[in-house]
Amino acid sequence: MSRSEKLTGEHLAPEPAEMARLVAGTHHNPHGILGAHEYDDHTVIRAFRPHAVEVVALVGKDRFSLQHLDSGLFAVALPFVDLIDYRLQVTYEGCEPHTVADAYRFLPTLGEVDLHLFAEGRHERLWEVLGAHPRSFTTADGVVSGVSFAVWAPNAKGVSLIGEFNGWNGHEAPMRVLGPSGVWELFWPDFPCDGLYKFRVHGADGVVTDRADAFAFGTEVPQQTASRVTSSDYTWGDDDWMAGRALRNPVNEAMSTYEVHLGSWRPGLSYRQLARELTDYIVDQGFTHVELLPVAEHPFAGSWGYQVTSYYAPTSRFGTPDDFRALVDALHQAGIGVIVDWVPAHFPKDAWALGRFDGTPLYEHSDPKRGEQLDWGTYVFDFGRPEVRNFLVANALYWLQEFHIDGLRVDAVASMLYLDYSRPEGGWTPNVHGGRENLEAVQFLQEMNATAHKVAPGIVTIAEESTPWSGVTRPTNIGGLGFSMKWNMGWMHDTLDYVSRDPVYRSYHHHEMTFSMLYAFSENYVLPLSHDEVVHGKGTLWGRMPGNNHVKAAGLRSLLAYQWAHPGKQLLFMGQEFGQRAEWSEQRGLDWFQLDENGFSNGIQRLVRDINDIYRCHPALWSLDTTPEGYSWIDANDSANNVLSFMRYGSDGSVLACVFNFAGAEHRDYRLGLPRAGRWREVLNTDATIYHGSGIGNLGGVDATDDPWHGRPASAVLVLPPTSALWLTPA
């Protein structure tokens, strides 16, 4: 039976005030007006479809035409109650009729428990309830598939869903707020599985903005800014890696990390191409881990990823989230751990992103003296707000769980810890005790670290922290921040200052190479020669070395051997493993051509490959990195000869003697104290001809005799090549 006659009812039109809010986009509960509503003896169906020329309700085999009341609101009164199911057939000018389930007849997709946990800041899988999620519901007329959307905007006057599906029209899909939670929600049937969308937010300040989804899993390729509905059907192949990860403690294991900016390692490669080429290269070079500069979506490529706008979306520049999963999977199957840089300290002010999201300071602190980072022109998160803290903690867990990431290197921790960080006098507000410590940030970092290690055992968290803050790597249960490791910025600065000097003057600065051992075991350290040291006019590691090309190459080889021998884990930025001569720029690729044009670059690359192989095979270089038992000086005081020497010890009883000649001339007949007599094998000589060195050395080893020296029971006489490193082990 077909019915198209107009039916009327006393409840056909909503109250004028409600209608006005609906049209203005500021109604907090459009579901209370739209959809099907039962009265005493009839049911009213209302649909808000501006620009539609006809709307028909399909109830079984019956058709009921909705009357256009005003401003795009259509309604019809059905002469019965207990309506089980219906569809809407909507026709626009010049278009064929389109039949769809009514979005305003579905219950909320978030439960009370989810909202309660979020309000308390304790929802550990928050990304599963906020954002965009494809869903299906079984109704009397069949299965209805679509996408549920949920966004936190507690001070907004109204929120609407806009996208390709409705021509970016801000009227057709108003969302409802779920009680006092501040979460706005809507399920939209038949939403495209990879459709673009945003939220049109009527801010508390009267400004209407179109916002990207803070929890979006996918985005448009920058400079476009819309969010994209994204789901995963990826099948992982790294079960063995993940099972082993849960049993490991990275602090006591080998860890040499290759730091990579994906866009400029070899420009033009996708995630899946990188899964082959980058993985093969890292395996060939022998690194145990790769650290990726931020992969979360960021609009400005020149920020290198450190100004994030979509914290839950891998950048779409190189492919889809599943493509990124394939990259991580390939690295894991090759035995390579994956660390990503994570940026919870601050976020950019783009008007379509997180800043003043609902017309008020929401994600950022409301006090400008705490809520803005002046140096970078960015906002600072309000770490004391439970929902914001939950957003960030859940984000850390998201990368660890959804993408199998093995570690987070937390950027700019010092800026989080201190309220007066890079602020002028009078430009900051003290904490409740009158101090400069950001107590809320401390609590956030402790919560993040404790939760991450609980949820994903075996992962590593690393702090980029350059101040004397005590206990960065101390467990949270004894008052520490709970990081696994922190960057040793002091070691980096002192070492680079020293090796940059002409050898003639190094003896006057010998303390720069010994000072780090006064605090080497106060924290668990990473020794970083990172991207920060090859930008902004600093040149490159190669460029810092004094002398001609032969001397520069020798200097860089000895520096790298010193880094690998010093207590702490290693991190080296891409390009430095072959001595790139040009300063790095994200706008172009590495100078791979150097490997075809000169032997020095090939020699440095070969050295890095070999020291990684030696490093992994010698627990003395890593198993006791964080305790004094893993290290002792042989001679820290030979400044006259620019020589340093020390022993490394492994938890398995192994030993390694390391000698560094930072003078520009060789030293013959150099006596070195050793712990035992007998044959000592030269496992590394950075001056070997295979590294394009001069070939000066000890013919593969030396014989130690029972002649005490340097306070040790035995000694050997060595030849120390100029600007070189020697590593020796008992034969």
Curated annotation (Swiss-Prot):
Any Gene Ontology biological process: glycogen biosynthetic process
E.C. number(s) listed in UniProt: 2.4.1.18
Disulfide bonds: 193-617
Keywords: Capsule biogenesis/degradation, Carbohydrate metabolism, Disulfide bond, Glycogen biosynthesis, Glycogen metabolism, Glycosyltransferase, Transferase
Active site: 411 (nucleophile), 464 (proton donor)
Pathways involved: Glycan biosynthesis; glycogen biosynthesis; Capsule biogenesis; capsule polysaccharide biosynthesis
Enzyme class: transferase
CDD domains: AmyAc_Glg_BE, E_set_GBE_prok_N
InterPro entries found in the cross-reference section: A-amylase/branching_C (IPR006048), Branching_enzy (IPR037439), GlgB (IPR006407), GlgB_N (IPR054169), GlgB_N_E_set_prok (IPR044143), Glyco_hydro_13_cat_dom (IPR006047), Glyco_hydro_13_N (IPR004193), Glyco_hydro_b (IPR013780)
GO CC annotations, alphabetized: cytosol
Catalytic activity: Transfers a segment of a (1->4)-alpha-D-glucan chain to a primary hydroxy group in a similar glucan chain
Coiled coil: none
Keyword Disulfide bond in record: yes
GO molecular function, one term: hydrolase activity, hydrolyzing O-glycosyl compounds
Family as reported in the entry's similarity comment: Belongs to the glycosyl hydrolase 13 family. GlgB subfamily.
Subunit structure: Monomer.
PANTHER family the UniProt entry points to: 1,4-ALPHA-GLUCAN-BRANCHING ENZYME (PTHR43651:SF3)
Role according to the record: Essential enzyme that catalyzes the formation of the alpha-1,6-glucosidic linkages in glucan chains by scission of a 1,4-alpha-linked oligosaccharide from growing alpha-1,4-glucan chains and the subsequent attachment of the oligosaccharide to the alpha-1,6 position. Is involved in the biosynthesis of both glycogen and capsular alpha-D-glucan.
Protein name: 1,4-alpha-glucan branching enzyme GlgB
